[in-house]
């Protein structure tokens, strides 16, 4: 499945540079390994999209409820 996600500029840039290889999100979309995330850069000051986007594959899921991750959230490894 493909998920289009709003991503703040500071985090978008870290994914773009390859430094950030995970996403933490509310799991209200039933994310699964193999999903594609389309990360669209969002400027929080202008409250608008910048026009930049990235596609990343979900390679691993950690469901919340333990190890400090809140129930209902998911940590996704992305490539």
PLM feature spans:
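Catalytic phosphate/metal-binding cores of nucleic-acid and nucleotide-processing enzymes, i.e., regions
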Residues: 1-79
């Amino acid at each position: 499945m493909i998920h289009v996600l709003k991503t703040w500029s500071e985090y978008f840039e870290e994914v773009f540079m390859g430094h950030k290889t995970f996403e933490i999100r509310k799991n209200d979309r039933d994310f699964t390994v193999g999903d594609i995330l389309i990360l669209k850069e969002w400027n929080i000051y202008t409250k608008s999209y910048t026009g930049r986007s990235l596609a990343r594959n979900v390679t691993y899921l950690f469901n919340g409820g333990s190890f400090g991750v809140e129930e209902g959230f998911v940590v996704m490894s992305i490539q």
